[in-house]
Amino acid sequence: MAIKRLINEHDMELWNNSKTFEDVIGFINTLALSVRGRENNDYTQPISDNVQRVSNLLSKVTEIIGKHEVIKDANTSRFGKIEFRDFYDDISEHSNELISKIFEGIEKPDTGKLDDICTYFINSWGDRSRIDYGSGHELNFICFLYCLTESKVFDLENDSSNIVLMLFIKYLGIMRSLELKYWLEPAGSHGVWGLDDYHFLPFLFGAFQLSTHKHLKPKSIHNPEVVEMFQDRYLYFGCIAFINKVKTTASLRWHSPMLDDISGVKRWSKVAEGMVKMYKAEVLQKLPIMQHFYFGYFLKCPEGVSEPSARAQDHHEDDSCCTDGSHGHSTWADCCGIAVPSAIAASQMANKDVRLFPFD
């Protein structure tokens, strides 16, 4: 069974120098390089049966979302909608059945391996207790794809670009639906000093897509007409369009200064290179995120890491994950703050013209 193991800085040092760390970032690099110069719909043909099966699995997730409408506090709360927990429970209950269908016609992994795959899949959709989502959950989806690759579902030589362009983009679309429908709170958002309240990898993959483009430049994100024209063709511009849609009170320079700074880089290839370095530093090397990372059969825990604690494995605890002092922080950690309503919630409440307080 996949379990959490990273609880202190010593563990993080072992993790940062481990083969598993290199396997994860190497997998992301392989996927990123495979989409250089490709638009979102530029799939590699023929599309393999296994890629199509995983795409069908994601379509089932969309169907499950449709079964759980927001009813309670639909118009009166800026925080995450509790119906998200019903969706999450539905996914958890049916994950084994759904994922088993991927292996029709090929060797199915044993129960332990399948349980690991299900763990990454379930945790790809956010946190049930806190009703939030962040880059750590996004990483779980990458681990899910990695496990399928290690299980011979994917052949990276032929499937890598389609894993990004068909599967990751479809996953991103589903997550946007969840964020909008259930007003998921941003898990560990860096506020204006982050790329996005929820996601990192669309910017990384998107920068690689654009790294060979002869005309579009990083500064093009400030041109509304260019963003509108290319939002469906490149991940990076799609992310900018989404941010502009939900953060309407100021310009990109004000609400997303990190993206504004990056837009000053001359070439997309340099942006892509910087995104990989930033992903290592801001996701894979950050304890508040990686304390929730699962190790198991496919992604081995480095030797010498702390033994697992029972509390760290609890998927559904209602209180803060930090009340036992099981890990330390050098900064205000992603997991220790109060609930922060999403920009999506603020935007939709404003559109409904709901005013809960006279100073709201």
Curated annotation (Swiss-Prot):
Top EC class for this record: isomerase
Catalysed reactions listed for this entry: [protein]-peptidylproline (omega=180) = [protein]-peptidylproline (omega=0)
Pfam families: PTPA
Localization per Swiss-Prot or TrEMBL: Cytoplasm
Alphabetical list of CDD domains matching this protein: PTPA (cd04087)
Keywords assigned by UniProt, alphabetized: Cytoplasm, Isomerase, Rotamase
Gene Ontology cellular component annotations, sorted alphabetically: cytoplasm; nucleus; protein phosphatase type 2A complex
Main location: cytoplasm
Single Gene Ontology BP annotation: mitotic spindle organization
Protein name per Swiss-Prot or TrEMBL: Serine/threonine-protein phosphatase 2A activator 2
Organism for this UniProt entry: Kluyveromyces lactis (strain ATCC 8585 / CBS 2359 / DSM 70799 / NBRC 1267 / NRRL Y-1140 / WM37)
